Curated annotation (Swiss-Prot):
Chief location of this protein within or outside the cell: membrane
Catalysed conversion reaction: 2-dehydro-3-deoxy-D-gluconate(in) + H(+)(in) = 2-dehydro-3-deoxy-D-gluconate(out) + H(+)(out)
GO molecular function: 2-keto-3-deoxygluconate:proton symporter activity
Family: Belongs to the KdgT transporter family.
Keywords of this entry: Cell inner membrane, Cell membrane, Membrane, Sugar transport, Symport, Transmembrane, Transmembrane helix, Transport
Organism domain of life: Bacteria
Name listed for the protein in its UniProt record: 2-keto-3-deoxygluconate permease
Membrane topology reported for the UniProt record: Multi-pass membrane protein
TM annotation in the entry: 10-30, 42-62, 73-93, 95-115, 139-159, 163-183, 199-219, 224-244, 254-274, 289-309
Keyword Transport: yes
InterPro entries noted in UniProt: 2keto-3dGluconate_permease, 2keto-3dGluconate_permease_sub
Annotated gene: kdgT
Amino acid sequence: MQIKRSIEKIPGGMMLVPLFLGALCHTFSPGAGKYFGSFTNGMITGTVPILAVWFFCMGASIKLSATGTVLRKSGTLVVTKIAVAWVVAAIASRIIPEHGVEVGFFAGLSTLALVAAMDMTNGGLYASIMQQYGTKEEAGAFVLMSLESGPLMTMIILGTAGIASFEPHVFVGAVLPFLVGFALGNLDPELREFFSKAVQTLIPFFAFALGNTIDLTVIAQTGLLGILLGVAVIIVTGIPLIIADKLIGGGDGTAGIAASSSAGAAVATPVLIAEMVPAFKPMAPAATSLVATAVIVTSILVPIITSIWSRKVKARAAKIEILGTVK
C-alpha cells in the first residue's frame, strides 16, 4: 500500500491528515488517552514535548553559511511577513473583542488566529515553488524562514502590539531548544545531518497530538471562515511581499507571492501560546481550526497564483527584450 504517497497528494497532508485523525479521536473518544494511559496517553497529549524536540531538530537543520543574495532575499521576505502580521495584530486588537468573536459568522475569529496564520511562511512550499519559477538563490531564501517556526515570533508580535505580556524567561524557554539545536548543527555537520532527518518525521506525531485538542464541531463551525482567512493571508501578506521583493530583494515579485502562505507549523501556535498565557485558552481550539484551514487554502492557491504571476512577468520581460532588440 502506498499510504505515504497518497497522503502527500493532499497539500500539507503529512501535517493535516494526522491532525484530522487526532480530531476524530478527540471528538468521539475524548477520554481515550486517560483510559489507555502510558505511552498511548503520551502520544495523544504530548503536543508540547514533541514540538520541543521538533524545534530542536529544526534549529539543527539550518546552516549558518549562506550567500549575501540568499540572506538579503530571505531577510526581506521574513521581516516583511512579520511586519505585516504586527500591523494586522495592532489593528485587530482594536476591532476584535479581547476573547475573540463569540457569535455570528465570524465566531471563533481572534487576534491570535490572525497572527498565527500570517506570521509564518511555509518554507518547504516556498522552496519547491521557487525551484520551478525562480533562481537557485531565490529557492535558497527559505534558509531564514525556519526562524519563523514556533511560537517565538507570534509571542514577540503579541507582546510588542500590547495584546499580551510574556516574562523574559518565557521567551528564552520558547527559543532555547531551537538555539541549542542551531548551535550543535553548525558546530558539527554530522549532527546537523543526523538531527535534520527528524524534522519531517516528527510532523505527523505532533500533528496527531495537536488534533487531540480539537473538536470536529469547531472545525465545522469555522470552515468557511477559515477559507476566507486563507484568502486574506495571501492578499494581506502577498501584496507587501511582492513590493518588498521588487524594491529590496531585487526580484520580480514572484518570490513575494510564493512566500504568502501559512506554514503547517502555525497550526500548533495557538495551543502553545495558550500554554504560556492561560487567557488565550478559550480561543485556542477555534484559532487552531481556522489556521489549519488557512494552511490548506494557501497551500492550494499560492502555487497556482505564483505560476500565473511568473508566466506574466516572464512574458512581459521577453516582450521588452524583443522590442529592445528591434530598436
